[in-house]
Amino acid sequence: MKYGRPFLIALVLVLAASFSGQSHDPASTSSAFALQKPSAPVPLLAKGRPVGWWVVFKLNAATFPDCGDGTRGCPFGGTVKTYKDAQQYIFASSESPTLKQGSGCAGDTDTDPIGATFGQVYNGSFNYLIWNDQFYDDPVIKGCTKECGSPWGHSKGLLAWNDAGNGFVMQVSTPSWPAAGNKAHPRKTDGDSLGCIKDDDVMVSQHFFALTLNKNDVVSVLKALGNASVVTDPSNPQIVNNGGPQDIQQLVKGLGVRSSSKKFLTFNLSGGVQLISKPSKLNVPPWQMVSAILGGVSLRAATWWATPEIATTTASTTVKCWDPSLSKPGAVEIATSGIWNGKKIGLTGGASPDHNHAKIGVSLAGPKNYSIFGDMNQQGSLSGPNCASSQNGRGGLFYVVSNPTLSKSVKALITGDTAPQ
């Protein structure tokens, strides 16, 4: 069969587009790109449902035990434990910023945000970094037994990225999870599924926050982690698979050491989220520091509030454990209870089911409508004599989301009793 010149030109253009990954059909473009190069890991509400960010608040075992109608499982290793368990959860996202009840067991399915987001890394081939000050010796961290105390950072999370440097960060408040980034390098003595590990980190409330990152954001997060002295081991493939752009690789290699920094860092990430990094040697009360960095905004925070407690403060409270690099903080209320679905929930620290290990905060007034997801508890000292006490003497990260709908929803969750001044 004989073809004319216009047809041959068109055929050449179609073939060229196919090999270059370009097409006028968006679905074809996506398929061609996927064949050439793995897409970036992203926050997922469920398998196949990417979002810019999500936040999960796992409820406590006293008020919302077990998984509701869900059945507990161990998709990332381990065995279902018989300890006090609560894997009911509420969540919000960039797609729908109002907190709502989730279904199933948090972290154990591909239809919940935690399980779906972590699963793409654990069962995939991405680069990853895990840090946690409470690995409980699996993996073993040189110089630490069971956990790494002060002056190591009080920080936990997962960073995952592709070879172009794009990916996501997931901040967690859970001790001993996650502690293995891929099924090729599982934990040696424990599981890696919520509710299926030796430590009961699903009895009290916990929080999880995941955020989409571009390559520059990944660099910023790594600088923030280094400044905060996070606990990791770049030489151990169980928790680090280093790759991608050279500047990212170099920053990863430099982690797992204690920083000498006394300077807080702030980064404006591409998704509109602000990141704050507190170094361990900046010996100030953590949430007063956040208030000051955000312009003296008044905050309400729910953390593991336990000895040595930092009391509720007003804008006129004297804070002697302070640094000249910081402006004056606003009021910081300590939430000791909240409410969900008409039920009161405990928001203090403690070793019984009606307690809280999440670290979340919200602005109380002003135009910014901040929701804050942090690494650090309100434990330490306002005015000494030991200004390096507890969390004052440790590092950590805070993610600040400015969204009026989310802020209203978080504020409602932690509205309740307040610690005295």
Predicted regions and their residues:
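Bacterial N-terminal signal peptides
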Residues: 9-17
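PLD/PLD-like phosphodiesterase catalytic module centered on the HKD motif
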Residues: 18-421
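Bacterial N-terminal signal peptides that target proteins for export
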Residues: 1-8
